[in-house]
Regions:
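A short acidic, leucine-rich amphipathic alpha-helix
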Residues: 19, 32-35
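A short beta-strand element within beta-rich, extracytoplasmic domains
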Residues: 161-180
Length: 297
């Protein structure tokens, strides 16, 4: 976390961000940077040094008119994990990251499809493809209407009681190609109980997702939003905001050897804008559908 603070201080400066933008187009020396920025050489050199000290750029000696120093960008992206020590050491929590292709039931309507890290799975816009054995390799799945359902193993220790269950997943709407303004009413069910509906604002593309493979055209869906559903004794919450009065007691978690999760768009949804679900090798977040199930000691 200390390193993240140091890097944030370095890039929290307009001149240094502009230097990184210029270096995204290719290597430059300080004179070239100063000219493009319209800044004095000395000011540019100071900012270059700060970026170099933070390991955000590298400086190399290259032959030219004599020998000159040339700066290059060292990273295309920076990821900061915001997990605290208390989260990392949390006890009495069962965490399962479910691959998006491991659903046990589905009912989907076109436009629909599944995509692995390297190719399409089955045929596009053909619901039969959702039953292909290769679906387990899916890193992106999408459909306009319907649902997919997952079953997590129920690992609550005998004699213990669950007090909170949480699901996190990267998700967005499903439009032709992509469309930022394309609302979709997405509903979540746990153990057959409707938890609530969230209206996703759009289907996001035009800018490549951090983990989206290069072969996947930029005009298609690229990334989603990371959403967190949480159910405890106080009710059901989406990103910390209560969305229903369903409590964890209503889910009867101790009655079955599994915990079911259904994600879908209802037939009568006001905004029937579909769903895209992302795996770790598509979108912006390296995860499937994570369940955190907390129980007493």
């Amino acid at each position: 976390m200390d390193e993240a603070i140091d890097i944030s201080k370095v890039i929290g400066n307009e001149h240094r961000m502009n230097i990184l933008k210029i270096l995204s187009t290719g290597p430059h020396n300080v004179n070239e940077l100063a000219e493009k920025l319209g800044l004095p050489f000395s000011t540019t050199a100071v900012n270059v040094k700060k970026l170099e000290d933070a390991n955000l750029i590298i400086t190399e000696l290259v032959p030219g008119r004599g020998t000159q120093k040339v700066n290059s960008k060292n990273y295309d992206r920076i990821v900061i994990d915001l997990f605290t020590d208390s989260t990392e050491k949390e006890k009495n929590v069962i965490t399962i990251d479910m691959p998006i292709g491991e659903y046990v039931d589905c009912q989907v309507e076109p436009s629909c499809g599944l995509v692995s890290e390297s190719d399409y799975i089955g045929m596009q816009d053909d619901p039969r493809s959702f039953y292909e054995p290769g679906r387990r390799e899916a890193q992106l799945l999408y459909f306009r209407h319907g649902y997919v359902e997952y079953r997590y193993p129920n690992r609550i220790p005998y004699g213990k009681k669950a007090y909170e269950i949480e699901f996190s997943l990267e998700i967005c709407s499903e439009a032709p190609y992509h469309k930022l303004d394309w609302p979709s009413d997405i509903t979540l069910w746990v153990n057959g109980i409707e938890i609530g509906t969230w209206t996703c604002p759009g289907d996001f593309g035009g800018q490549r997702g951090f983990n989206t493979p290069e072969w996947w055209t930029i005009y298609f869906t690229q990334y989603g939003l990371l959403k967190h559903w949480k159910i405890n004794q106080n009710g059901s919450f989406l990103d910390g905001v209560q969305i229903s009065d369903v409590t964890i007691s209503d889910l009867n978690l101790h009655d079955k050897p599994f915990v079911s999760l259904r994600i879908g768009v209802k037939e009568d949804a006001f905004n029937a804008g579909g769903i895209n679900l992302f795996g770790p090798n598509f979108g912006n977040y390296e995860q499937g559908i994570i369940m955190n199930l907390r129980h007493n000691e």
